């Protein structure tokens, strides 16, 4: 009986402790939730200019920390900065190299920004980029025998090839959009999976049926010489002002679509507040599919520019630059604003160009450039991803 009484008292005491601790735990959780709500409110209420200011401040801080790391590792930070500037803008070749990277970052960055701005996560831009590139090359090679050689035929083939790339990229983007809108599938998972599928299928085609006759390397046949962007201003292989002009034109068109059209309004509303959009008469599911298709089409155009301006053929995508993945950081740096993608792409293009120069002409490890880019991504992505997560999960003190 005594033991039973002691156990009963012990049980009652434990229950009292649990009841006593419960309100404190609830208070702690409540305070933490209120703190998250306040932070979410501030991020969600921030204007585009405020978000860009946060991105610029984060980038500046990341660059300063990067220079501190350079100094700690035993290198002269001022000499490092000099090498970066020289590698990015030191001469005509450096500028052309920087603008080449910038062109690709702008196009792929806009593709990411379209989806992210609408509240959906298209992580499959790299796959859509690869599909668009191969589609461009093969459509041009197949159609070339039916069109006259020369400038006129070359322009027609470029237009047809780029259009085919946009269609292929758009279809690749539409699939995860359909799965999300009508099957409630997580688009992050589906787009990542489609990246692997795209790279695998394109790699098989380049190494097999589409491999150029007599090629030792897994490449397609080269495009006809008259199917190329003209070398204007810069006489540098791998870059043409025409490619940059296409990228800037895409930025303008996307900006106008997103800010001046009903589709742009529906796109953003459906992504962030699907129930409210449906109540207002918007077919939210159809709009999500259209958004992913639009994003994929721009990624396909990026692949077309890469194939025509840089390669002149198509190779195993395993060796193709990962512009589609880097574009996620570019878009986040620009606060998912298509206009902001231009300076963000220039920053990444300049750093990539500088890394190429430093790797050849300096004893400074090129990995330091990668480290600085990583810091920029970390500092910039954290607040923007928190804002996007808050919008998607309903964080915030107000009803949204």
Annotate each predicted stretch with a short phrase.
Residues 65-88, 208-221:
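Interfacial/capping segments of alpha-helical transmembrane domains
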Residues 102-111, 128, 171, 193-196, ...:
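Hydrophobic alpha-helical segments embedded in the membrane of multi-pass proteins
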Residues 187, 191-256:
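Transmembrane helix-bundle core of multi-pass membrane transporters
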Residues 239-312:
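Helix-loop-helix "hairpin" substructures at the membrane interface of multi-pass membrane proteins
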Residues 299, 303, 307-374:
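Transmembrane alpha-helical segments in multi-pass inner-membrane proteins
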């Amino acid at each position: 009986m005594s033991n039973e009484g002691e156990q009963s008292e012990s049980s009652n005491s434990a229950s009292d402790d649990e009841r006593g601790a419960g309100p404190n735990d609830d208070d702690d959780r409540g305070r933490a939730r209120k703190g998250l709500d306040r932070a979410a409110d501030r991020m969600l209420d921030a204007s585009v200019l405020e978000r860009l200011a946060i991105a610029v401040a984060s980038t500046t801080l990341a660059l300063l920390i990067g220079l501190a790391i350079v100094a700690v590792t035993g290198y002269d930070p001022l000499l490092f900065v000099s090498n970066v500037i020289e590698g990015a803008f030191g001469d005509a070749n450096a500028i052309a190299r920087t603008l080449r990277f910038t062109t690709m970052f702008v196009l792929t960055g806009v593709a990411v920004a379209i989806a992210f701005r609408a509240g959906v996560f298209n992580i499959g831009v790299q796959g859509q980029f690869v599909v668009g590139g191969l589609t461009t090359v093969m459509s041009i090679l197949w159609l070339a025998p039916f069109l006259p050689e020369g400038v006129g035929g070359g322009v027609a083939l470029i237009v047809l090839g780029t259009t085919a790339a946009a269609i292929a990229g758009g279809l690749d983007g539409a699939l995860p959009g359909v799965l999300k809108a009508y099957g409630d599938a997580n688009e992050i998972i589906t787009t990542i999976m489609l990246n692997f599928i795209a790279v695998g299928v394109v790699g098989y085609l380049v190494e097999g049926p589409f491999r150029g006759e007599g090629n030792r390397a897994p490449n397609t046949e080269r495009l006809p010489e008259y199917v190329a962007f003209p070398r204007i201003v810069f006489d540098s292989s791998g870059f043409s002002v025409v490619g940059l002009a296409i990228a800037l034109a895409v930025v303008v068109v996307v900006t106008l679509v997103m800010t001046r059209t009903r589709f742009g309004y529906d796109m953003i509303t459906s992504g962030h507040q699907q129930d409210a959009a449906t109540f207002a008469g918007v077919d939210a599911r159809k709009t999500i599919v259209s958004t992913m298709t639009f994003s994929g089409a721009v990624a396909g155009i990026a692949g077309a520019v890469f194939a025509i301006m840089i390669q002149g053929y198509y190779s195993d995508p395993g060796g193709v630059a990962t512009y589609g993945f880097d574009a996620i950081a570019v878009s986040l740096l620009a606060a998912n604003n298509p206009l902001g993608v231009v300076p963000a792409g220039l920053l990444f293009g300049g750093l990539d160009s500088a890394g190429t120069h430093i790797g050849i002409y300096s004893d400074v490890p090129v990995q330091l450039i990668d480290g600085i880019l990583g810091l920029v991504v970390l500092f910039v992505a954290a607040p923007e991803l928190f804002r996007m997560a808050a919008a998607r999960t309903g964080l915030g003190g107000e009803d949204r």
